[in-house]
């Protein structure tokens, strides 16, 4: 999974997204010596901001992250993601430590199999 620091200029985020053919990137910041995901940058939302500036940092264009516990059933995870409108979620342990990231596409693939484009 590709992530960027909150201090990464949006110009770099855009280039990274183009190179990797992605539209959403989790953003992290060091907190007490550990990387913590603090949000998600979505290109579509960022680029349509009236005051968008590619020199600004990724942290200036964050959407709040959705956290899902690692033991949550997939059907419940799907419902939470649908309600929140998020396409990415941060998976956490009971102690709130981050253990991974799941995309809506991953959940749909597991529940329904591959869907043609």
What is each model feature region?
Residues 1-117:
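Soluble cytosolic regulatory domains appended to membrane proteins
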């Amino acid at each position: 999974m590709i992530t960027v620091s909150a201090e990464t200029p949006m110009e770099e985020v855009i280039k990274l997204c183009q190179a990797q053919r992605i539209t959403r990137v989790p953003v992290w910041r060091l907190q007490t010596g550990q990387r913590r995901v603090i949000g998600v940058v979505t290109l579509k939302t960022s680029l349509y901001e009236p005051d968008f500036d590619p020199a600004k940092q990724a942290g200036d264009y964050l959407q709040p992250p959705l956290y899902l516990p690692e033991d949550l059933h997939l059907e419940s995870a799907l419902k939470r993601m649908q309600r929140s409108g998020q396409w990415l979620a941060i998976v956490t342990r009971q102690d709130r430590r981050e253990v991974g990231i799941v995309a809506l596409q991953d959940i749909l693939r597991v529940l329904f199999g591959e869907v043609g484009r």
